[in-house]
């Protein structure tokens, strides 16, 4: 395997960082790598906010669910789906772009663009010996995040990313087997096979937790997912997204 593939396959989330800031050169390289990601129709419909102000980082750490690694890391990035720039383009070119930038299609484009950029950033950071952790908790209270980061309409903070020097490393979590996520020619709809594969994966995940905790935990993947999905989390999202004039057409 080449170094790129080894870096990708060695990914694990880091939640314990040294209190050591990244250099500007490191930040610049990570952002440049993010910008090199594919983007739909050259729209580049995202922005990246680097949060260096300690007070803002501490506020964000509280808002996202009291996650200390949001405040203590080398650098904290927030990746935003951004169509505000395109509203400005409409003004500059004297073209009414209201309907397109408020459409579901352009909303999806912006979220995908932000996600592709973020994954490039993650790969770049890890190739530099740094650790990363995506922070979906940014979406716990988007109104508060919006106030902290002063984002305008047509800009949605999608997730954060803590980056820094790992103080400790977690084990890599086993992923779903390839045969369960890769399908050729058509979607696999054999429910019995589907369930059999998930039961096999449950054994792998339970073994992972048992080894990691000395036998104290034997969580299954389906059990974890069922517990998470039965909670009505972030049900305000549709209304908030409409409030900032996205995904309403």
Give a label for each model feature.
Residues 1-249:
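Acidic, surface-exposed loops and disordered segments
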